[in-house]
Amino acid sequence: VLEIPAMELIMPVYLGASDAHLAAGAAVLGNTSAPIGGDNTNCVIAGHRGWRGADYFRHIDRLAVGDSVTLTNLWGTLTYTVADIQIIQPHEVEKIKIQPNRDLLTLLTCHPYASGGRQRYVVYCEKLPTMSQSR
């Protein structure tokens, strides 16, 4: 489950970005990290920017650096902080690859809104080490 307070959003997250999964919520893109966190991971979660009356990632532009994003899986809840926001071209797949020594959650949607997907709006969220992990 993905929770983004700044967007007033709570939505399910499915494994695999099939049409059915994206119609029902957000989905982890194939060939990206599983939604379990850890060093050298980047879990990329895609969502429609509005779909058949549901907002989904419609208001992703409300997010700002420093905002909190949580992802709950079967083992617990991971809390991330928005670290960067970029607008990229659809072919720039290197921008969503794993970055060494970082634990990332990347949110991905079409941009601009209702444009048919000419570009991608990308929100990079990083899980910062807790005090016990940084010692």
Residue ranges of predicted features:
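Solvent-exposed, non-transmembrane regions of membrane-associated and secreted proteins
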Residues: 1-135
